[in-house]
């Protein structure tokens, strides 16, 4: 995930996300790579095995934005050469657009200059849709859940996978503080 997508990284949020994933039994890799092709290039130094990246539609659309590759002499073509080296596949998680339509690799929109490049990767099987998803989950956004937690709103627990809310509460992640924690003990003013 690119946590810098909305500007500067909130260090506490970043560490809480990593801690939550670890507590849920997931492996977390933290790096200073801001481009996907650099992550792939790094792992290519240690493994000859085929690699895959799972990402959401919005992340894939961003990958096709030339502004991220201006510092490379070969521009976006150099980056994509490194990214798709060794038959890398992108497994694409859908999203809903502003009209509520599900966006997949079949109907996503990239900049007109990138359209043919995207079609090349799609046609050659480099972009594969994740089909096993629950459409109701496409209406849940981490930023919304985080705001609910920080404001002390109810209902955020139901938006998360089983066991996740319990870890957030127990470890007091994302500024979570339940009412019991906010009450002062009897006799203290």
Task: Annotate each language-model stretch with its function.
Residues 1-189:
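Nucleotidyltransferase catalytic core that binds NTPs
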